[in-house]
Amino acid sequence: MKRLLFIYNPHAGKELLKPKLADVIDIFVKAGYEVVAYPTQAYRDAYKKIKKYDSSEYDLIVCSGGDGTLDEVVTGMMKRDRDKREPIGYIPTGTTNDFASSLHIPRGLLEAADNAVNGEVFACDAGRFNDDIFVYIAAFGLFTDVSYQTKQSMKNVLGHLAYVLEGAKRLFNIPSYKVKV
């Protein structure tokens, strides 16, 4: 029997996965997988889990969460030897899910779960900036840490607006520079 490691962030977005978790796992099982479910417990937890598992244990890795959870899984996978990288499926349950939208991954949890186990595998570009891996965006500037500094509790209540409010707090701290033209 094929084996699937399901890494998920139970607090992503507005905790959308929790009420449908059994249905998602059922889709995996019906697709012929023995499933090991791993709920993340802290920042970088998904990264650590992916880096240390034995590649002979799983045929497919599926992650569920926001762009941050996906980033941790991809980063962990890219740090593994090339011959020890399994395909990654993604079920977007974050606040904005920009990466999933750009790849036309279904927004519905059950549709995305089915897509993860029955969809077509395709290559996805990954970049490296110093020692950081990225698949969606690499940025610099004044507001780049907004998505990381926005509290999960605020995202759960306000959704995307939480990012806007966190960014607005930074407006008062933008340094000014004297320039001569």
Regions found by a protein language model. Give the residues of each.
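Catalytic core of DAGKc-family lipid kinases
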Residues: 31, 80-181
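A residue-level signal for conserved active-site and pocket-lining positions in enzyme catalytic cores
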Residues: 9, 67, 146
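Short beta->alpha linker loops
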Residues: 41-44, 65-68, 94, 141
